[in-house]
Amino acid sequence: MLECMKNRRSIRKYTDQDIPESLLNELLEVATRASNTGNMQLYSVVVTRDPANKEKLAPAHFNQPMITGAPVVLTFCADANRFVKWAECRKAEAGFDNLQTFIASTIDAMLFAQSFCNAAEEKGLGICYLGTTAYNADQII
């Protein structure tokens, strides 16, 4: 893994090769092992394969060609919703309407995303992490 990390670089042009669902699921499963806030896993991942949906996402990412050129686009989201529902089921107060929640969920999403990226690169896949989600989240939601 160290050699992979030392040699990593953003890949902006992709082959037509599809990413098998089994490999994608394996990478997502591995990434769930990432450190996170109190095991609350305050993130969600949206997987986009459909070319029409990638076209719709492109403007939110400043029309960078990696969005439409990649076989699959993953959008990593800070998301406390699942934990709030868990707390409600237990008649507990989640207390997630503050800056701390924003920070914790953002950190969780970033840790998950980085773990996913490391695992994908270890499997020989090229990735390009785009920070544009933060600029245009309202267009993506």
Regions found by a protein language model. Give the residues of each.
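Acidic, surface-exposed loops and disordered segments
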Residues: M1-I141
